[in-house]
Structures are given as structure tokens and as C-alpha cells.
Amino acid sequence: VSTEEEYEFKFNREYKNFNPDGGDCANFASQIMYESGRFKKNSIWNYNNRDGTKAWVNAQGFKNYILNSGRGSLICKGSYEETYKESYNLRPGDFVAYEKGGRITHVSTVTGMDSKGYPLVTCHNTDRLLVPWDLGWSNKTIRFHLIRVHY
């Protein structure tokens, strides 16, 4: 069982649940990356003693770190209409960041594809397992950032 499946609806006790502090989405995405064994913690992206750095626990900080560190690259960003075709280039392990009012307010991890190749995501906050990446984000002002992770 993968990290995202095992800890989607029951949180991993090795990590703090950051929902009371504003959200757990970036913490969960960081756990998935770290538990994959392909990424080591560092001084900027780190979790220790029940606390995490901004890059580990904050959606905006997480997205900025992934892109600025070279651990990921932007596939595209924009409205749903501007990004849905490119979304078919997402692969399990990649991320979607959701921008509202000029700020990244949520991130989710691509964890599968439906029968037509449409990306499915898993995330915390509104806990979801294998749902379409755009589900619940129909507000026309939302901008999506599709991010390829370099594993």
C-alpha cells in the first residue's frame, strides 16, 4: 500500500496534522515525496520534531520550493480552459497547485489516471483519494499550476 493510500483518511502518526494550523495539504504532499525514498530532507524542505519548514507545510512555500530547487518544473499554468489539455501530461507523483486571489492555497498529488487518461489526485484538507484534479475547483478565477516532479 502506498503512502497516499495508507494515510489518506487516517493520518500518519509520524507526522503532525496541520489542519488546525491552516491546512495539511503541503505536509501530506511532502510526506508522499519523502516517503517515496527519492528525496532527502534539507535545510529548506524539512520536517523534524513535529514541525516543518515553510517549504514542507505551506502550499505556496511548497510550490515555490519545488520549482526553485529544480526538483520540479512547470508544465503550464492558467484557467481550466488553458490547462486541461496539458493536464494529460501529468503523471503519478506530479503535483497540481491551486491559485486563488494570487496565492497558492492548495496542492494535491497526482496518484493515478482514469480509464481515459485523465489525472486523478489525492490530497488532505478536503481529504480526497483518486479524484479528478479539477473536482471542486469550478470557480472561474482559480488558476491551476501543473507541476512535473523530477524523480
Question: Model-found features: residue ranges?
Answer:
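N-terminal capping segments
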Residues: V1-V57
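Loop/turn elements at helix/coil->beta-strand transitions in domains of secreted/extracellular proteins
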Residues: S36-R38, R91-F95, I142
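Low-complexity, Gly/Ser/Thr/Pro-rich intrinsically disordered linker/tail segments
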Residues: L120-R128, W133-Y151
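Active-site scaffold segments
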Residues: G23-I32, V107-T111, T122-C123
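Short, solvent-exposed loop/turn and secondary-structure capping segments
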Residues: N42-W45, V107, W133
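...with weaker cross-activation on analogous glycine-rich loops/strands in unrelated enzymes
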Residues: N49-L120
